[in-house]
Regions:
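C-terminal outer-membrane beta-barrel translocator/porin domains of Gram-negative envelope proteins
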Residues: 153-158, 164-250
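Gram-negative/organellar outer-membrane beta-barrel architecture
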Residues: 1-2, 7-149
Length: 250
């Protein structure tokens, strides 16, 4: 099943794309698997392609393969901050955000794989990995991040008592994942520096049937990142832009 997509936003102007998805059952498995593809191009020369899926394998011992991979190329404008020393000779000692933006190019590819194994009917535990390869071409700046390679390893725990994965009418879904990531040596004015990241994500949903055709649903979702490197006053992670202005601050 596929549909065309047309959208408009002030950040990306007109966007044109397509979304495809397929549902199927793998051998010896009652749960339904899904594979999705989507891609978009904007009139500001921003574009991305993305593929993701949730596959169920095994008979009585069910395990999942959840994956997400893609590539994006998003020219954008980065509004950095200035420091005291930048304008010390001019007598301006304030700290704040620069009024004039800096054009830059953000190109990144990513791969996320999770493989939870069901230890009983509702609980699954398994490993996960997250890989990010990014290239930031920032004009008129002393910071070079070219390329940035980050590899993260961790684990995921999930609980799923929903009566239907795609159109649930009752049940609870809870998922917690934690990863630790390492980057390659990043070139900065003071030398080379590696970055260590910790990421904690949680997703909690509940579906409560109120009547025959009315369902109350709520969701809590959060993602926390910790980053450690010695030179703290240099922003090694600028905004990673997405179409429509939904930026991700790394």
């Amino acid at each position: 099943m596929g549909i065309p997509v047309v959208n408009y936003s002030p950040e990306s102007t007109w966007e044109f794309g397509a979304a495809l998805q397929g549902y199927f059952r793998l051998p010896n498995q009652e749960r339904i698997s899904i594979v999705q593809f989507d891609g978009t191009y904007s009139l500001r020369n921003q574009w991305y392609v993305n593929t993701q899926g949730n596959l169920y394998f095994g008979g009585k011992k069910t395990w999942q393969l959840q994956f997400r991979t893609g590539y994006s190329d998003c020219p954008a404008t980065y509004y950095g901050t200035y420091h005291d020393s930048y304008f010390a000779n001019e007598g301006n000692m304030n700290i704040g955000m620069l009024r004039k933006g800096t054009p830059y190019q953000s190109q990144r590819g990513y791969l996320n794989i999770q493989a939870p194994i069901y230890v009983d009917e509702n609980i699954a535990v398994g490993p996960m990995t997250d890989v990010l390869v990014a290239r930031f071409d920032i004009q008129n700046t002393y910071t070079t991040i070219n390329p940035l390679v980050q590899v993260a390893l961790g684990a995921v725990v999930q609980y799923d008592s929903r009566d239907n994965v795609f159109y649930p009418s009752k049940g609870i879904f809870a998922k917690v994942s934690a990863t630790a990531g390492w980057t390659n040596k990043v070139e900065i004015p003071q030398g080379q520096q590696s970055i260590i990241n910790g990421l904690l994500a949680a997703d909690l949903r509940q579906y409560i049937p109120l009547s025959h055709s009315l369902i109350l649903a709520w969701q809590f979702k959060t993602q926390l990142m910790l980053s450690r490197y010695e030179i703290s006053h240099i922003t090694l992670y600028p905004m990673l832009p997405r179409l429509g202005g939904q930026d991700g601050l790394r």
